[in-house]
């Protein structure tokens, strides 16, 4: 059952998988192709396959078969990385900062020690 992505979050492992898919030039990959990118010790093929099933059920990826390889499923993201960032940041702003952009920015300004050049760049972006 596919659910609304705006109400879904990705686990750390799911996020790692999605980042690998988003980085693909072909915008899709099989479990075997994804597995080849992992450093040793690699997760089990079945473990990665289970995560792909979960991501499919959550509505983040779609399994497809290519014409040139009718046996293997290739998984294509159904949401862009930027779209997911927007969803997550909106949720963080609303749930942790009471919907206040000012509180969110204030938190990062105080906690992250933003370099002066980045502050100037941020101010320029705000003025646009």
Predicted regions and their residues:
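Short, cationic-aromatic polyanion-contact patches
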Residues: 10-13, 66-87
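Short, hydrophobic-biased segments on the C-terminal half of alpha helices
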Residues: 49-53
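A short, conserved structural fragment
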Residues: 56-66
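Amphipathic alpha-helical dimerization/coiled-coil segments
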Residues: 84-128
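Short alpha-helical segments that sit at the start of domains
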Residues: 1-20, 80-83, 128
